[in-house]
Amino acid sequence: MTPMTPMTAAPPPTATPRPAFPGRWVGGASLVLGPLLLLTGVLLRLRFDFFFPAQLGAYEHHPHLMTASYGCVSAGWVLLWPGVALLAARIGERSPELALWGGVLTVLGLFARTFHAGVDHLAFRLADVQGAASATRTVSETYGAFHIFSTLNAAVMGGWLLLAVGACRSRVLGPLRAVALAAASAMPLGVLKGTTPLSVAAAAGLCAALVPLGVAALREGPAPRAAAVSGRLLLTVAAGTAMYFFGQAG
């Protein structure tokens, strides 16, 4: 008789390690800070009319308020990209195709919004030098000019919709928070856009969908040592200060 070979148990499945980049700290902070900055900036210009002549007029009479508003919004969009990368990675554990397309399109949309913020900045500098009336005339005459980032307008809106579907299907977000995430697609896009009810709904939806996810990401895993936290904070402050002065040097 052939001797029976002992049965060996199959090795337990190993969990897929989560990527080190952007990581829970950078990604979690992004998911918390980005939406809150967006909502703050949107609310700061709530009382002014939506279209660009009123936005430039508001800047002429309230330069500090409008600078803070547009600064918060542009910083919020930029800070969101690590959070989008983290969200796409979580979605990709169960829905890789939606994670890929949703993540790529959303990040491309963030690039487009950053371009719009640069044009906003130039328009406000024109208002400083030439006055709001002259800046309004210049913007009006050049408003429809083609730029390469206009090809990303669909990505600005569609990326959030794909991420919302992927987040719901992969159970990263529940149905209500997925709908709130999809509301980000309603944020008006383009140059010198003021605040509308859709703007407030979109920014509030991002806060409802992403801030709790960011807090949960920050709480995952073991708490870091106090020395490590202090060191990273000091490094962040030092790097930020150096980058600020380097940028001012031109």
Tell where the protein language model's regions lie, with residue ranges:
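Hydrophobic, aromatic-enriched alpha-helical segments typical of multi-pass transmembrane helices
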Residues: T2-G250
